[in-house]
Amino acid sequence: MGKVRVTKNLSILLLLVCSLALNVLFILKRVRVFDDESSSSDELSWSRRPAREAERVAAISCSGHGRAFIDSSLVVDEEEEEEGPVCECNSCYAGSHCQNFLPSCPVNAKSGDPLFLEPFWMENAESSAMMVAGWHRMSYTFKDSGYMSKQLKARLRQMHAIVGNAVTEGRYIIFGSGSTQLINAAVHALSSHNSYSPSLVVPRIPYYSLYKQQTEFFQEVEYKFEDDASLWMNDSATNNLIEIVTSPNNPDGQLNHARLQHPNDKAIYDRFYYWSHFTAISSPADDDIMLFSLSKFIGHAGTRFGWAVVKDETVFTRMSRYLTLNTVGVSHESQLRALRLMKVIIQGKEEETMFDFGYKTMRNRWEKLNDIVSISKRFSLQNIEFQYCNFFHKIRAPSPAFAWLKCLRKEEKDCHAVLAAANIMGCRGSTYGAEDKFVRLSLVGTQDDFDHLLHQVKILISEEKPNRFDSDHIPCDLFSFL
């Protein structure tokens, strides 16, 4: 009996062990299945190859003085290109990896390319990257929202609320292909549409030169350009005035307000630089028409995306019709990229936001240049006051996008020529409707551009000698400072 009982107990024990073993195996198998399913769902398929290509190109070394892009290549002749992306060097650098500085190269202080923000986006490479499928939004329109992304509109309203630079609640938002298209759409919407009494487009001197160039280029019988708003301040006979107010102003960074106060006068506010990295945000702007662009906001000039905030429904409708007939909406890829970048900024780390990075960079550049010019008796810069900023909750130092430099000597009436003799290429004052004793110098370029500018200005001021150099007119390329 004892042996039978022992055998029975062993059998039961064996069954228990087998049962436990089977359960363990079953659990392990289930876990493995879930892991396999998870890894399978995370595994890249069609996006794997373009992702690898993007990583490979981004890793190309350009000695810190240039960038390689997927679509960059060295053209050997019209029908043949060298294989693979190559480095595109910053101004005054050359070589296969941009390793050679060209000391005699003129400083590029003309361009308004906002490349000062490039380091921020490189630091946020993962969160700002995006992959676009070959079949992404092939239609002309978004479902139920026409030519404009509803999600992007919502993000723009959210961004303005965070920064506190514009009232958007109860306002219409319309997209355009950069700032240039929006300016003309707004002028068209506000014009009298009367060939016998055309509207006059008037900015305040110094003004952003694109206003004049574009208005004259697209000039219709319904409107024409006039140089100075101050000439029309006391004119009550003219009822069709459209004042373009740039605030902060390009080129001098001043916070302008409309001068024309007649009931029939209209104003378009260029708010492209009304962001906390360029100026103090004192209150939300609440103008009838306010224009903004992605290039001035986050640096992506090549995306060609801008937007207008409009109060009046009739004006909004006329602008919308103009933009629809002009380009049938804005590129869906541009809207997608704008949306992606907007999310990065909204969800940004508090310790290093784009606004912090941008403000520190521009403030430091202005301080360095101003410190050098302030000791000169030959040159001066515009005066910009310290102001309280509601976004940063503190009094902030100036950080303008451009330096508006003036030659102080009576005999030096062509300041552009004076700087050109010192290998510094800026934009003439007359380009902005002002005297040629002024020159606009861009501060928004690469760090290489700014360092080179600072070096040449130091040399020029250290000499402080009369200079009667007279150079040929060097035009400021329109597309270099949009």
Where does each model-flagged region fall?
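Short, 15-30-residue, compositionally biased linear elements
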Residues: 51-52, 82, 415-417
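Ser/Thr/Pro/Gly-rich low-complexity linker/stalk segments immediately outside membranes or between
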Residues: 28-57
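Short helix-capping and inter-helix turn/linker motifs at the boundaries of alpha-helical repeat units
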Residues: 57, 75-79, 394
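Extracellular cysteine-rich, disulfide-stabilized repeat modules
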Residues: 68-70, 75-92
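Disulfide-braced loops of extracellular cysteine-rich modules
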Residues: 55-65
